[in-house]
Amino acid sequence: MANNLCGIIEGGIDPDLVASRLSSLGWKTESASWSSSEAETRWCRIEIDQTDDGTTLINGVIDPQQIDDLSRLFARLGWQHSLELSDENGSVVQERRY
């Protein structure tokens, strides 16, 4: 399946910290590069990266039925965020903001 999830975590949170927090909740995590991490659970796989200006980006694949769960999880961790779920044509079909 092609990537269907993209988003931003506000506040310039380091990708390693995002991965560490998700790991403590049972997600499988690993370093993807010098500046990015990957996190995976049975219903979602994301890459977490940080741009030169400090914006924390996420993108990956999620079971569309779980986007609310991911948004609630990020909110519970205190992360302001925006998430976009796209269909197979790349059109945004759902958005979540906290």
Label for each model-derived stretch:
Residues 68-98:
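Acidic, proline/glycine-rich low-complexity IDRs
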Residues 2-4, 55, 76:
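A general secondary-structure signal for short beta-strands and their flanking turns/coil
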Residues 15-16, 66-68:
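Short, well-ordered alpha-helical microsegments
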Residues 20, 36, 72-73:
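Intrinsically disordered, low-complexity regions enriched in Ser/Pro/Gly/Gln/His and often acidic
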Residues 1-25, 97-98:
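Short, extreme N-terminal segment that most often corresponds to the first beta-strand
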Residues 28-66:
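Short, intrinsically disordered low-complexity segments
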Residues 23-33, 81-83:
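Short secondary-structure junctions
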Residues 6-8, 57, 82-84:
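Ordered hydrophobic segments in well-structured contexts
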